[in-house]
Amino acid sequence: MNTDKKAVTKKKVKRNVPQGNCYIQAGFGNVIVTMTDPTGATVSWSSAGHLGFKGSRKGTPFAAQVAAEDAAKKAMEAGMKSVDVYLKGPGAGREPAIRALAATGMRILSLKDVTPVPHNGCRPPKRRRI
């Protein structure tokens, strides 16, 4: 006899979002790309680590490109066609992520750099000596 109970899962709501926002967080160690609707609700997201890149490979331009493509494809399935892009962080994946978005056929309406700049806040990490 099979007495295992099936897990109850919510069905994903298909919604049509023609325009939205794309937030690219490009740090030195990883790249996170989030696609949202105009209200800020997440439509899709992806990151280099989520796609199987490990360690120092997560911060590479190629990893950023793959992450942006993945997030854009998921968003296009939800009907997204155009985005406002918000960039944050000093990472190497900034430019490749934007190029990958454009290459998937997503229309980029605007580009904004929202990298937080301290008014001389915390002391930065010491320089690496290799």
Curated annotation (Swiss-Prot):
<keyword id="KW-0699">rRNA-binding</keyword>
<dbReference type="InterPro" id="IPR001971">
    <property type="entry name" value="Ribosomal_uS11"/>
</dbReference>
<dbReference type="GO" id="GO:1990904">
    <property type="term" value="C:ribonucleoprotein complex"/>
</dbReference>
<dbReference type="GO" id="GO:0003735">
    <property type="term" value="F:structural constituent of ribosome"/>
</dbReference>
<keyword id="KW-0687">Ribonucleoprotein</keyword>
<dbReference type="InterPro" id="IPR018102">
    <property type="entry name" value="Ribosomal_uS11_CS"/>
</dbReference>
<dbReference type="InterPro" id="IPR019981">
    <property type="entry name" value="Ribosomal_uS11_bac-type"/>
</dbReference>
<dbReference type="GO" id="GO:0019843">
    <property type="term" value="F:rRNA binding"/>
</dbReference>
<dbReference type="GO" id="GO:0006412">
    <property type="term" value="P:translation"/>
</dbReference>
<comment type="function">
    <text>Located on the platform of the 30S subunit, it bridges several disparate RNA helices of the 16S rRNA. Forms part of the Shine-Dalgarno cleft in the 70S ribosome.</text>
</comment>
<protein>
    <recommendedName>
        <fullName>Small ribosomal subunit protein uS11</fullName>
    </recommendedName>
</protein>
<keyword id="KW-0694">RNA-binding</keyword>
<dbReference type="InterPro" id="IPR036967">
    <property type="entry name" value="Ribosomal_uS11_sf"/>
</dbReference>
<comment type="subunit">
    <text>Part of the 30S ribosomal subunit. Interacts with proteins S7 and S18. Binds to IF-3.</text>
</comment>
<dbReference type="Pfam" id="PF00411">
    <property type="entry name" value="Ribosomal_S11"/>
</dbReference>
<dbReference type="GO" id="GO:0005840">
    <property type="term" value="C:ribosome"/>
</dbReference>
<comment type="similarity">
    <text>Belongs to the universal ribosomal protein uS11 family.</text>
</comment>
<keyword id="KW-0689">Ribosomal protein</keyword>
